[in-house]
């Protein structure tokens, strides 16, 4: 294992980047303290920085790289599309092909629309839910992340029965007055909130598994009770499966748990690692979108040919190679081995995860956002740097999920477990 690494070239690049890019990064999650490493290349399960250090990667671009980096099947699909052109501004057969494939795996989706990001997908889904129901309010889960648009950037922890306050400057408090919050895994509070607001409540949007603060898993029966509650009160249920879609199973969390929402958002994996987002749902809802209906949505890069071509290759490969059986088995092994390490070390930590997602919480097992916040964030950050020095790249935040790819080898996993054992 690597005991020391040099990041001088990355440090110099960071100093230059700060003069040109706010914070030196294009997304805040990449701003590793005291400075991030800058990637030069990636292949398979490995990622290499400017200084030549190589790491086993469990961040995987925060989820999309389910086949690892630079996969030949995805690369060939992109190369073939590049030869035909990469942006037309017209419909393509590729869109129809991928739409048909996605809909075949997701029982909640009769029709869908392609966008360029997960943020666009959830933003458009909420607009559509409001337009379809002619109602204004929606409920999100405390700690649930649905992208960077104004309506969902609301602080968690302010109480499920109070109106949300913006979590960023630049968002008027009046704008988020229709954004309500409920704790995850708390069906009683959710029931009270739904029943109190149902006359003006368009939807409940939820990550079935909270992937951006964990993963934190649903307690047994929680999703089923939520589905029943929304149906009884004529409120739309939206599953944000940007992380779990094609990750837990071909049909995402709704296949894994057997709970079917009214609408679904997808991203990350479905584009094969290229920019994409999807929102879909029941036909009567989706037909409200322009030009068929009066809910407007548009985008120059929506249905980008290269992204859609990569998505077709990704979906076909995942299905034909039965990838999820291998992935989920590796996830089970990783979590069991980590639990044994934690127990042997006598640590008050908790190993959590599902399918090919895993994490060690530096604290007790959390079931909601407030419990996640009790974890030792500084302790985790120090651990992250020790793992990086040992050649293992994990997400730098206690609140982000680790992912396993189809190309992580047995040797990769054993080296990783050795690093955990040495560095916890």
Swiss-Prot record:
The record's InterPro entries line, in alphabetical order, gives: 4pyrrol_synth_GluAld_NH2Trfase, Aminotrans_3, Aminotrans_3_PPA_site, PyrdxlP-dep_Trfase, PyrdxlP-dep_Trfase_major, PyrdxlP-dep_Trfase_small
User: Coiled-coil regions in this chain?
Assistant: none
Q: Which cofactor does it need?
A: pyridoxal 5'-phosphate
Top enzyme category: isomerase
> What EC number(s) would the UniProt record show?
5.4.3.8
Q: Which residues carry this modification: N6-(pyridoxal phosphate)lysine?
A: 268
Q: Name one GO biological process term.
A: protoporphyrinogen IX biosynthetic process
Q: Name one GO cellular component term.
A: cytoplasm
Top-level taxon in the UniProt lineage: Archaea
Query: What PROSITE patterns does this protein map onto?
Result: AA_TRANSFER_CLASS_3 (PS00600)
Localization recorded for this chain is:
Cytoplasm
Pathway, per Swiss-Prot/TrEMBL? Porphyrin-containing compound metabolism; protoporphyrin-IX biosynthesis; 5-aminolevulinate from L-glutamyl-tRNA(Glu): step 2/2
- Which keywords label this protein? Cytoplasm, Isomerase, Porphyrin biosynthesis, Pyridoxal phosphate
Any GO MF annotation of the entry: pyridoxal phosphate binding
Q: Which reaction does it catalyse?
A: (S)-4-amino-5-oxopentanoate = 5-aminolevulinate
- Alphabetical list of Pfam families matching this protein: Aminotran_3
Q: Does the keyword Transferase apply?
A: no
Family note: Belongs to the class-III pyridoxal-phosphate-dependent aminotransferase family. HemL subfamily.
Concerning HAMAP family, the annotation shows: HemL_aminotrans_3
Recorded protein name is Glutamate-1-semialdehyde 2,1-aminomutase
Organism name: Methanosarcina mazei (strain ATCC BAA-159 / DSM 3647 / Goe1 / Go1 / JCM 11833 / OCM 88) (Methanosarcina frisia)
Lineage here is:
Archaea, Methanobacteriati, Methanobacteriota, Stenosarchaea group, Methanomicrobia
Q: Which gene encodes it?
A: hemL
């Amino acid at each position: 294992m690597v005991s020391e690494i040099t990041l001088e070239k990355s440090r110099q690049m960071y100093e230059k980047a700060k003069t040109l890019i706010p914070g030196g990064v294009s997304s805040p999650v990449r701003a590793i303290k005291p400075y991030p490493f800058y990637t030069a290349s990636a292949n398979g399960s490995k990622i290499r920085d400017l200084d030549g250090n190589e790491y086993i990667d469990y961040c995987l671009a925060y989820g999309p790289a389910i086949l690892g980096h630079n996969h030949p099947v995805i690369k060939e699909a992109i190369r073939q599309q590049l030869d035909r052109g990469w942006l037309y501004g017209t419909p393509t057969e590729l869109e129809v092909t991928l739409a048909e494939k996605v809909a075949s795996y997701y029982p909640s989706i009769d029709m869908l629309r392609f966008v360029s990001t997960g943020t666009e997908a959830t933003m458009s889904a909420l607009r559509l839910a409001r337009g379809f129901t002619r109602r204004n309010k929606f409920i999100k889960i405390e700690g649930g992340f649905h992208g960077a648009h104004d309506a969902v950037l609301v602080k968690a922890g302010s109480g499920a029965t109070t109106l949300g306050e913006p979590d960023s400057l630049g968002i008027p408090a009046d704008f988020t007055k229709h954004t309500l919050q409920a704790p995850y895994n708390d069906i009683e509070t959710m029931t009270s909130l739904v029943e109190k607001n149902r006359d003006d409540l368009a939807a409940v949007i939820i990550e079935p598994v909270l992937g951006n603060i964990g993963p934190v898993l649903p307690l047994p029966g929680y999703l089923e009770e939520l589905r029943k509650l929304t149906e009884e009160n004529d409120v739309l249920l939206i599953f944000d499966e940007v992380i779990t879609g094609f990750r837990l199973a071909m049909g995402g969390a709704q296949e894994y748990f057997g709970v079917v929402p009214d609408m679904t958002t997808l991203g990350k994996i479905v584009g094969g690692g290229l920019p994409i987002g999807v929102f879909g749902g029941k036909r009567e809802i989706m037909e409200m979108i322009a030009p068929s209906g009066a809910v407007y949505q548009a985008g120059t890069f929506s249905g980008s040919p290269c992204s859609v071509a990569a998505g077709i290759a990704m979906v076909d490969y995942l299905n034909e190679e039965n990838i999820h059986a291998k992935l989920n088995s590796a996830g089970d092994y990783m979590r069991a081995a980590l639990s044994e390490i934690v127990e042997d070390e006598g640590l008050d930590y908790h190993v959590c995860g599902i399918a090919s997602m895993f994490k060690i919480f530096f604290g007790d097992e959390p079931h909601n956002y407030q419990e996640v916040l009790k974890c030792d964030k500084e302790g985790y950050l120090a651990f992250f740097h020790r793992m990086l020095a040992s050649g293992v790249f994990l997400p730098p935040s206690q609140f982000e999920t680790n992912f396993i790819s189809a190309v992580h080898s047995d040797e990769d996993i054993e080296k990783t477990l050795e690093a955990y054992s040495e560095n916890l």
